[in-house]
Amino acid sequence: MLIALNGFGRIGRTVLRTYLQRLDDISKIPIVAINDVADPKTLLHLLNFDSTHGSLAKIGMSADIENTDGVFVLRICRKNQIAKIFLLNEPDPQKLPWKVFKINIVLECTGHFRSYKKANLHLKAGAKQVIIGAAPFDYVDACVVMGVNDNVLSKKLPIISGVSCTTQALVPLLFTLDHVFGLNSVLMTEIHATTADQMVLDQAHRDLRRARAAGHNMIPTTSSSIKATLQVMPHLDGKINGYSIRVPTINVACIDITVTFDRYVTLDELKTQLKTASQTSLKSIMAYNELPLVSSDFIGDTHSLVVDDEYIMQAGTAFKIMAWYDNEVGYANRLLDMCNKLNNCL
């Protein structure tokens, strides 16, 4: 399996960093090329020094760049191991050398090529498959949530969406509840750290709320996770709604859902089912926390979600459930899980 990253922003860099940490020998990393419109010097600096996850040096690695006649290669070192990855600077995906590199999977992490037509440009350039690292703008061959419907993954699907970090957190929770109790209604509030789509100071934006200063406001806005959830659980159409509140932190989000069920459920029964799922069918996807933690405690957590036991509560027939997730590391791990599962498909 050979992988290319298109886009080396927050998600692209976290994907690389995560893959490096997974490997016993980083020289065997299957990521062979990274494309981004930023200059190599800037990309190198942002990889080496990360405000959220710390420097590469703190995890025993260092990075530099080789420039041979204008061909840039990112070198990452860990002890006596060296990973080498081509750095490209091509704004048009159709012109990327995916055929030359024999790329199997492009992880599309720019946030810009989220329509089928634009993602298809990678296929025209010679890649076998594309995983869009975001909720799609229109249709794709499959929207995949690990732990729920990843059984649909196949090398016959040209364009796949990894939906969003919030969808990867929300759907396993809803799937578990629906399977055991039957969901009657779901209202979700996504409390999300600031993203690159927001403004540092008040400035023009298509969303007038996101136009306001990110570090100075709690900003209500839409959440793509509702539409994406319906791609995986279409029978919830008309039963689910929700929105996002962006808050001035740099990482980790939580979902706060209020649900009603098709049958009578007790609080103890609900907690038991979620805890059991976290230890069995969703062991690497969902964790269950019983400690009094706050958002920064979940930085670096590899799960899609961590259910907070203390904030599962009941009022009448309605239940409230809160779950945390590292919106960068958790999501990066799911994208890599998709790549590995595709690699093992016949």
Regions found by a protein language model. Give the residues of each.
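N-terminal Rossmann-like NAD(P) cofactor-binding subdomain of oxidoreductases
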Residues: 1-200, 204-211, 337-338, 345
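Generic structural signal for well-ordered, non-membrane alpha-helical segments
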Residues: 8, 12, 115, 163-166, ...
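Predominant activation on well-ordered alpha-helical scaffold segments within soluble catalytic domains
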Residues: 16-17, 120, 171-178, 189, ...
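Glycine-rich beta-alpha junction loops
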Residues: 37-39, 136-137, 164-166, 190-197, ...
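Short, flexible turn/loop "capping" segments at secondary-structure junctions
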Residues: 152-154, 210, 247-253, 313-316
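Short, solvent-exposed beta-strand edge segments and adjacent coil->beta transition regions
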Residues: 156-157, 213-215, 252-256, 318-320
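Acidic, glycine-rich segments within the central catalytic cores of soluble metabolic enzymes
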Residues: 179, 183-250
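C-terminal active-site/capping subdomain that shapes the small-molecule cofactor and substrate pocket
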Residues: 242, 254, 258-346
